[in-house]
Amino acid sequence: MQELANKVEFGYADIDEAFPPCDPGIHPFGSRVLVQIRTPKNKTKGGIILTTETRETDAWNTQIAKVVAVGELAFKNRTTMEPWPEGSWCEPGEFVRVPKYGGDRWTVKTASGEDEALLVIFNDLDLVGKVTGDPLTIKAFI
């Protein structure tokens, strides 16, 4: 079964389809980072229409996200409030890998009004890493 799942391709047309523009309606406080989780496709590259349950499972298991906003104290020493020696781990517009569980999650309508975007606020130390490759090709493993 896992072998079949690894062969399914979703074929996003572009980055805006995977991370559609939306207004999160919030800016993170302190050392928190606001990210938008990659939006699941309605159908596969081969034309198979995905059920709502499949799309929801994909959305809640995807760990690739676009950084939307960074709190004023993110990536700073908690005692001195000075920036970390290595600097910020990520900036708005960059892509990161986030934990599957945790964070404060909610959805908002996208700018088109057709889909919902899943947004999550994490503590800066909870981010797993920066995506250096194509964020559209990284698959969710369920």
Model-derived features: where do they sit?
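Compact, glycine-rich, soluble single-domain proteins
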Residues: Q2-I142
